[in-house]
Amino acid sequence: MAIKKPINVKQLSDKLGVPILPDDPQTIYHIQERLGKGSFGQVFKAVHFANGKVVAIKIISLDDQEAIKDVRKEISILAECNYPNIVQYFGSYFKDHQLWIVMEYCGGGSVSDLLQVIDTISEDEIALICREALKGLNYLHEFKKIHRDIKGGNILLNDRGEVKLADFGVSAQLFNTFSKRNTFVGTPYWMAPEVIQENKYDGKADVWSLGITAIEMAEGLPPNSNVHPMRVIFMIPREESPALTDKSIWSDKFQDFISKCLTKDPAERPTAKELLNHEFIQTKKPLSILSDLVENCKTLINNSSMFEDEDEEEGNYSTFVEKKTPSDDEKENNNNTVTNYSTVITKDDDDGSNNYSTVITKDEMYSTVITKDDAQTDDDNNNFSTVITKEDPPTDEESDSSCSSSSSSSRNITSPISKRKPRQPITNSPKISPISSNNINKIPADNVVSSNQATTTTTTTTTTTTTAASTTTDQDEGDVKNIVNKFQLNKPITSSNSTSVTPQKPPFPSNNTTTTSNINTPIKPSNGLKKSNSNTPVQLKTSGDKTPTTTPLKNISNNNSVIYNNSNNINNNNNNNIIAPKSPSPTTGQKIIKTNSGGVLKSSGGLSSKRSPSSKPKHSSSSKEPKESLSENLQNIYRNDCTIQLPFLTLNNISSDYLLSIDYRYNDFKSSLDDLCADPNLISSKLSFSPYIGNLIKSLSYHKDIQENELMTPKESVQNTKIVNDLSSTVKTIFRL
């Protein structure tokens, strides 16, 4: 392990701009529990040993220089603030290459936390929260500070109902009354139009964010929450100001307050001080209604936790392993000595409605039986069993011996499946190859049992299952015939919820109506991509398309083998999916099916799927966020402290002069968009956008120019093509091309 470089505490104190207390924090505070992960580290609840005061401690590793750079802003703001509506800062400590920042603890959580419990907040409660938040903002603005990230998640409440502004990680200091910021920072859904357009802005940007937060408290979510964040960045400056969805249930003064906060022109938008005189804010309700709100939410959470604990206790689980050697009489029937092992896992509910049983047996003849029976229903198709065997077809005597051995080993096993109806067998199950091209989408190969194997193990499986279930005598003959494989071999695998709408990954319109992806013609990397005729309509690529090279791909060693399709193996049957590499684009709503080393089909799409570490590509993709920090000029364009970023951009190899240039040939956005859409009228209507989006298109033009005009190695060509596809997909998402 590498030895960490010693840190000079005095230099660290000078760097942060606040004194570092010399004491060991663990001798002063007792850590109780982790509250979560903050913007730049972990946050813990702690208690002061001497006075018993509860505090929140943010612990940050000093090895992360970016985190230190960002947290310095928060500490400098908090250390200078002393106001009831601002989270109080108590001091900083240094221990084990970690910075401990001690702050005020707010036991009520954030407004967003409350909305997770009660969905919406009443109008009187919203008025109080907005009034207290405006007091905190007015204090900040008078000291020439901007919060820049006001939202429900950064407005905290304590147990007494007091409202505190928190998380000053992106706050900025205004050095004089007339100075304004012009950096792109904040959370997209709460962001003011002037911030997105990178115009000059001041504390009135916080007022806009508070208006969005008021809608968030009233409706549970901010406006446009079902839209992709990058799309929202484009929508906010162009569309009308948001408003409450159902105005009939809210008072006129509340609606007027929101409209004042969400005035598009910042020059006409009132300040925080002016809004403190608004009729909606002049409420006579006491802060005790907020403390009652916090208490009610805590009660609901505690009751919910109690119900969950009771549900877990209702399930009766039993697991036992039994090893038994057959008796002398059983050995006489079989010349070989057989030792049987069985593992049984059962769960029984009192009402008998949810009964699960798993029986696994293994003997010296290497037969394995895995059986899972769901609760008895009128539809027998809901009950299924899987039989896997490694033995040769036994003789009649061996079958009889196997039956008696299984009965002996499982004699004391009791299972709830004894009350279930016999299942009807499926006859003439076809033998299917696990990697057959005709059946690649129908059934996982590991679960396929051939017809002769099913016949071989019917007797053994039946005896194990029926004895484990303690079946009655009227089931003797029926159960021998009822161990079957209930997989539906003729149904393709289907995926649901592939187009679920969420703020992170909404479905985007596509020109494709079939289930297959477009197959592109291979290109030669050495010659680059040729520009298409501008008179010829350009067919848009889908987000799942890849641009392969003519260089043969050999020995691709990955746990999940990827099958590249060409024009010779395309099947027009709608039931067959094309197996293709997964696109890195975030806009795809289509599920890609690929096989693992065992031939089992695996879904890699969908919002809830997670890739295991073993399924990561062998080579790091150029679409990853660069590890190196960007130059100062690039920081002005793609800021690290911006909440919403494009993580796949690799910008270190792009000249700062290129991105910062105002020369027309570097800003010909129309030609870049022409390659993505053939409709000139549509393009001309999309050319009004912020410099931030313009720089994105500049990056696209840069990489396309390299692809078309410079010689590259095959590897460089593939990487550059991938970047072009990623950027093109993002631009098409923003402009809905």
UniProtKB/Swiss-Prot annotation:
Residues 29-281 form the Protein kinase domain. ATP binds at L35, G36, K37, G38, S39, F40, G41, Q42, V43, K58. InterPro entries: Kinase-like_dom_sf (IPR011009), Prot_kinase_dom (IPR000719), Protein_kinase_ATP_BS (IPR017441), STE20/SPS1-PAK (IPR050629). The active site is at D149 (proton acceptor). SMART domains: S_TKc. Keywords: ATP-binding, Kinase, Magnesium, Metal-binding, Nucleotide-binding, Serine/threonine-protein kinase, Transferase. Its EC number is 2.7.11.1. Pfam families: Pkinase (PF00069). Its cofactor is Mg(2+). Residues 491-503, 529-554, 585-596 have a biased composition (Polar residues). GO terms for biological process: intracellular signal transduction; programmed cell death; protein phosphorylation; regulation of MAPK cascade; signal transduction. It is an enzyme of class 2 (transferase). Residues 305-356, 372-475, 491-559, 575-631 are annotated as: Disordered. It comes from the Eukaryota. Residues 334-345, 401-410, 425-444, 454-473, 510-525, 597-615 have a biased composition (Low complexity). GO terms for molecular function: ATP binding; metal ion binding; protein serine kinase activity; protein serine/threonine kinase activity. One of its GO terms (cellular component) is cytoplasm. It catalyses: L-seryl-[protein] + ATP = O-phospho-L-seryl-[protein] + ADP + H(+); L-threonyl-[protein] + ATP = O-phospho-L-threonyl-[protein] + ADP + H(+). SUPFAM superfamilies: Protein kinase-like (PK-like). Belongs to the protein kinase superfamily. STE Ser/Thr protein kinase family. STE20 subfamily. This is Serine/threonine-protein kinase dst1. It comes from Dictyostelium discoideum. The gene is dst1.
